[in-house]
């Protein structure tokens, strides 16, 4: 899903994306600001249920604008169910977004409040589609859990991920990353908001049902600095740290945000 014609600086950043990806100005773009007083409590929403098998964890990759932890997704060993979904969604990957300072690195905001970072756990609709590639552009193709991260205490549950970053310092590097259950990164409460949105970077497909956890998790300033120490360049060229990779909030354009609580 990555391509070299976009990034996060002035010349190729979010303000420019619509030139190459007109859907950037679409009606269902993400992220959004969640206005808690306008979110509608929906009693039909079921509790979120995640069942992730640590054996499906596969590898960690520097993709140039971020890093991804990828999972084996050829069967339903690791799935998301419940919430607004009637189908089960298969775990594919997780990644983080961060900013150049601790004040603002999240993508979603809540009542205008910005967070330091944001975790995205990505799933695809394996009940209806045969692969992520097929699902990624479909309206009901993807389900992403978003977890806001607040600067404060170090989060020991991030340590295994952070310890792997040294092996993927530059763009294109990959390393095995095994025996990991990403549900350990979720907050203790799985109360959530949900809305219909998009991928938050090109190709910006409007194919994501978002599950944004109400409760945040912690991350320390030092841990955030480790994210920013990753490089967007290939090995052997001038080092360019990945300082930020968060898209600003987009207009709701009449969409409803529903709350499970």
UniProtKB/Swiss-Prot annotation:
Coiled coil: none annotated. It catalyses: hydrogencarbonate + H(+) = CO2 + H2O; urea = cyanamide + H2O. GO terms for molecular function: carbonate dehydratase activity; cyanamide hydratase activity; zinc ion binding. It comes from the Eukaryota. Inhibited by acetazolamide. Zn(2+) binds at residues 95, 97, 120. Substrate binds at residues 200-201. Pfam families: Carb_anhydrase (PF00194). Its EC number is 4.2.1.1, 4.2.1.69. InterPro entries: CA_dom, CA_dom_sf, Carbonic_anhydrase_a-class, Carbonic_anhydrase_a-class_CS. The keyword Lyase applies. The modification N-acetylalanine is found at residue 2. Residues 4-261 form the Alpha-carbonic anhydrase domain. The active site is at 65 (proton donor/acceptor). SUPFAM superfamilies: Carbonic anhydrase. Its cofactor is Zn(2+). Its main location: cytoplasm. It is found in: Cytoplasm. Disulfide bonds: none annotated. GO terms for cellular component: cytoplasm. Residues 238-261 are annotated as: Disordered. Catalyzes the reversible hydration of carbon dioxide. Can hydrate cyanamide to urea. Belongs to the alpha-carbonic anhydrase family. This is Carbonic anhydrase 1. It comes from Macaca mulatta.
């Amino acid at each position: 899903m990555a391509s070299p014609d976009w990034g996060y600086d002035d010349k190729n950043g979010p303000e420019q994306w619509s030139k190459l990806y007109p859907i950037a100005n679409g009606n269902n773009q993400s992220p959004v600001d969640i206005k808690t007083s306008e979110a509608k409590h929906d009693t039909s929403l079921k509790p979120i249920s995640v069942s992730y098998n640590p054996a499906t964890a596969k590898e960690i990759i520097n993709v140039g604008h971020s890093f991804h932890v990828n999972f084996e997704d050829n069967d339903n060993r690791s799935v998301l169910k419940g919430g607004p979904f009637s189908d089960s969604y298969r775990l594919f990957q997780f990644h983080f977004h961060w900013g150049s300072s601790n004040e603002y690195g999240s993508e979603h905001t809540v009542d205008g409040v910005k967070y330091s970072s944001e975790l995205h756990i990505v799933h695809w609709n394996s009940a209806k589609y045969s692969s992520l590639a097929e699902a990624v552009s479909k309206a009901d193709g993807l389900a992403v859990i978003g977890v806001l991260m607040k600067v404060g205490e170090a989060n020991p549950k991030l340590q295994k991920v952070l310890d792997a970053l040294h092996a993927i310092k530059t763009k294109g590097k990959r390393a095995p990353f095994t025996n990991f259950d990403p549900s350990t990164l979720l907050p203790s409460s799985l109360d959530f908001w949900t809305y219909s949105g998009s991928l938050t970077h090109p190709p910006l497909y409007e194919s994501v049902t978002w599950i944004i956890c109400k409760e945040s998790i912690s991350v320390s300033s030092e841990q955030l600095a480790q994210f920013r120490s990753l490089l967007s360049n290939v090995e052997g060229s001038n080092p360019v740290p990945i300082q930020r990779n968060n898209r600003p909030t987009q207009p709701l354009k009449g969409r409803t945000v529903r709350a499970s609580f």
